[in-house]
Amino acid sequence: GARARVDLCMFAEASRHHEELSAVGHMGKVECLLPQNIVTRGARSDWQVHSEIVQIEQEILDAGYHSGATYFQNQAFLNAVRGEARVIVTAEDGHRAVAMGVAAQISAAEHRSVTMQELGL
């Protein structure tokens, strides 16, 4: 099966990057660094590392806070409540997200892989 580790730090004010997101898996690693908008990909197959600066739309920059994520999430929620758009994140999605956290805790404590099936999913 697939494996990955995600590390998100959004409170790194006293560092080079205010927000850092990285995911590591069997194929390599990807890092996203803000506010520099740098995406770096490293492949295990050839040990090549490639970085690029990603251009962010002005609308997203203007939205602020977490590069607009909070603004756009709240906007989508309001549209769904009004019946103007479909629900993007369901209660089932939330249930699965909590289960992933529980699985991670069990995995760390017991030094083993944990399946979603063990948690009733």
Predicted regions located by residue number:
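Generic secondary-structure boundary/loop-capping signal
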Residues: M27, R44, S113-M116
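Short glycine/proline-rich turn/loop motifs
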Residues: V54-I60, A85
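Contiguous beta-strand/loop segments that form the cofactor/metal-binding neighborhood of enzyme cores
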Residues: G1-N37, G68-E84, V102, G120-L121
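A short glycine-threonine-serine/GTX helix/turn-capping micro-motif
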Residues: I60-G68
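C-terminal helix-rich "cap/oligomerization" subdomain common to oxidoreductases
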Residues: A76-L121
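Residue-level detector of alpha-helix boundaries and kinks
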Residues: L8, D62-A63, N79, V89
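Mobile, glycine-enriched helix-loop/loop "lid" segments at the mouths of ligand-binding/catalytic clefts
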Residues: E31, Q36-Q55
